[in-house]
Amino acid sequence: MSLSERDKQAVWHPYTQIKGAVDTIPIVRGEAAYLIDEEGNRYLDAISSWWVNLHGHAHPYIRQKLDEQHQKLAHVMFAGFTHESATVLCKELTTVLPKNQAKFFFSGDGSSAVEIALKMAIQYWRNKGIKKQKIIALDGGYHGETLGAMSAGAKSVFSAHFQDYLFEVTHLPFPT
């Protein structure tokens, strides 16, 4: 059974309706900016696998650094724990960013980062005792797939089915 056939039996892909799912392209590896399928066809990964692979696939330096880190520590939750790599990165960031940006919050992905930013803004004003309940975002943005991120993003075919569950956001024109 081919990879595409096995995939169709077990995987539900983003932005698809299961009954109408089409065959997927079976990617078996990546090289630099290209994805390669099981027949050796090459595809330019023009969106960096949804914007998270900006330096290409199988980059030797990144692979080396990931391997070095994985041999020391693959992961530790950040609630009550820390580790050297995170602390060093944050300290280095303080040397290149404005002085008022001296603390950093890690997130696992863009959608979660948007959710966290929304929660931080809400908590900030609540802690000050000021009742602020409006969220403002720029028109036309894509902020992710969670309900909060879809609320802040542009209304589209991706969020249409969830309109009744999204919270109110005031969208402003993008500055020119």
Predicted regions mapped to residue ranges:
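Glycine-rich loop-to-alpha-helix module at the N-terminal edge of alpha/beta enzyme cores
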Residues: Y15-T16, R42-I130, I136
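A generic fold-level signal
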Residues: V28-G30, I130, D164
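PLP-dependent aminotransferase-class I/II
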Residues: G140-T176
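Active-site-adjacent loop/helix segments that line or gate small-molecule/cofactor pockets in enzymes
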Residues: M1-E31, S48
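Short secondary-structure boundary/capping segments
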Residues: I25, N127, A160-Q163
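Short, acidic, Ser/Thr-enriched surface-loop or helix-capping motifs
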Residues: D37-E38
